[in-house]
Amino acid sequence: MTPSSRLTTRRASRNFRRMLLLILGSVSVVAIIVHAEKISYLIRPLWDTPPAPFEHYLPHYYAENVSINNLCSLHGWSLRSEPRRVFDAIIFSNELDLLEIRWKELYPYVTKFVILEANTTFTGIPKPLFFAENRNRFTFAEGKIAHGVFPGRLATHGSHEPFKVEAEQRRAMNHLLRLAGIAVGDLLIVGDTDEIPTPHTVKLLQWCDGIPPVLHLEMKNYLYSFEFQDDYTNWHPTAHVFNQWTQYRHSRQTDVLLADSGWHCSFCFRYISEFVFKMQAYSHAERVRRKDFLEHSRIQRIICNGDDLFDMLPEEYTFKDLFKRLGSLPRSASAVHVPAYVIQNADKFRFLLPGGCARSPG
């Protein structure tokens, strides 16, 4: 090989390496952009810290046929001469089945079911007033219902701020609660429709004196149905002994947490169309990164596998916890300790029970 040909070969080799590096760099940049959120979750233990643990994690005592007097005493509280009035307040979207289960479970203990809905989603998409249009389904609770409508705002040019709209609706709920007649000393339950307190928890807080003025209610987390239970628990719902400063909020408000107080059944819908609606409607709708995320066949497969609808990694703060929760949720064959109304109407709510993962399109 002549010197000139060797020089040409070296130049070609350098050019090839440069081109290869350029291609690899471009692919890497595209991959980072496409998977930025997933990468962020993967390295969360490096840049984020977990919220402070609750300082007061209250044991929760309950068994059938134990008197409320004994239960109050076990918690260090005393029995009231009469129960508190209870106001159950939710901002409603489209979870009609879970609303029915919630109200049937809590009906004996609740004075007023306070429900606020809007004609747009948090993301500014027009939506029906699902509760108003299906109110005849809830005639069993008609005398206890206080219903309000929030005039939503349509999104324009992608500038909508879903968390700001959500905060506005929570402020509107404060006004609706006062219209519903809530008074100082009443018990206020704050939570989303799918965060359902157990009836005995509400009864306990209704009948006992000495309870904390504000406490969070720990709830077991379920995904798609009661067949898939997640390891971690939900602490967002709260119970308040109402006073003039009480605000309807879904954020952390106290360091007191009552153990094992209910069920959080996330994306527990009957129809695939309801999954599609919520994926586009709720505050984290930016997680729908591709159109194929909304394909019915994909959603159905994910429901039956116990996978994540948004192809997200778990939100964890240590690599140990992150790797522990990778993969599909384990399937459970147990339908013990689920809402009684679901078991009493098992044919109607088969989709929430083990073996019922198949959904209709809707």
Q: What are the functions of these language-model segments?
A:
Residues 88-94, 116-117, 190-193, 217-220:
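Short His-Asn-centered micro-motif
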Residues 67-86, 119-190, 198-203, 324, ...:
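Active-site-proximal specificity loops/subdomain of glycosyltransferases
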Residues 195-311:
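Conserved catalytic core of nucleotide-sugar-dependent glycosyltransferases
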Residues 83, 87-108, 118-120:
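Active-site beta-to-alpha loop of glycosyltransferases that engages the nucleotide-sugar donor
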Residues 93, 120-121, 152-154, 194-195, ...:
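Conserved beta-strand elements of beta-rich interaction domains across eukaryotes
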Residues 1-89, 94-95, 311, 315-362:
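Juxtamembrane luminal stem/stalk of type II transmembrane Golgi/ER carbohydrate-processing enzymes
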Residues 106-109, 208-210:
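Short, conserved loop/helix-junction motifs that constitute active-site signature segments
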